[in-house]
Structures are given as structure tokens and as C-alpha cells.
UniProtKB/Swiss-Prot annotation:
One Pfam family it belongs to: Com_YlbF
InterPro entries with a match to the protein in the record: Com_YlbF, YheA/YmcA-like_dom_sf
Entry's family note: Belongs to the UPF0342 family.
SUPFAM superfamilies: YheA/YmcA-like (SSF158622)
Protein name as annotated: UPF0342 protein LSL_0473
Length: 114
């Protein structure tokens, strides 16, 4: 009998070996090594976290949205931040593809058109 946990653990190991993961890991190290970029990175992550918390609570504050837009614009002035966002998009595509594969059996179970 197949143990899906063994498969999942192997997937985790394979993900760590993927080029997308290695690229992301490398650019995060560069961001952390550059004080100015890392400061903007932390500001952006904090603003994103605040926005996400408010969305979950259903209490979206316009000031938080505006602040996030301003910080995002500031971050776009830093080449390393732009590289980071590019690498985040690449790994996000990979993870989305993996999710589609993983959830395919469930999609088939609930498919009302088939």
C-alpha cells in the first residue's frame, strides 16, 4: 500500500532541489544582506500581514491599503525587491501546478459535469 505521507515528504525534498526554490533562497539571502532593501522588505511584509489580518476580520481599512500601495511603490525602486518578486512569482506558479496535481482526484470526485 502506498503511503501518501512518504510521497509528500519526497515532494518536500524535491521542492527544495528545484531551481525555483534555489533561486528564491538566493535572492532572499541577497535581500537580507542589503540593509536598505531588507528594511523595505520588512515594511512591505508587515503591511501585507496587516492587510491580510484585516481581510480575515472583514475590517479593511483604507489607510492600510494606501500604505501598502505606497510601500509597494517604494519597494519597486529596489532592484533586489523586483528580483525577489519575480522569484516569488516563479515558485508560486510551481506550487499552483503542484496543487492542481494533488487536488485532481478530489476535483474528479466532485466534478458535476462528468
Amino acid at each position: 500500500m502506498i503511503n501518501v505521507y512518504d510521497t509528500a515528504n519526497q515532494l518536500e525534498k524535491d521542492l527544495r532541489e528545484s531551481q525555483e526554490y534555489k533561486d528564491l533562497q538566493a535572492v532572499v539571502a541577497k535581500v537580507k544582506a542589503d540593509d536598505a532593501t531588507f528594511a523595505v522588505y520588512k515594511k512591505l511584509r508587515e503591511a501585507q500581514k496587516t492587510l491580510q489580518e484585516q481581510q480575515m476580520q472583514g475590517t479593511l481599512d483604507e489607510k492600510v491599503m494606501k500604505s501598502l500601495q505606497e510601500i509597494s511603490q517604494e519597494a519597486s525602486q529596489y532592484p533586489l525587491m523586483m528580483e525577489l518578486m519575480e522569484k516569488e512569482r516563479a515558485i508560486s506558479v510551481l506550487i499552483d501546478d503542484l496543487n492542481k496535481i494533488i487536488f485532481k482526484p478530489l476535483s474528479e470526485v466532485y466534478d458535476i459535469e462528468g
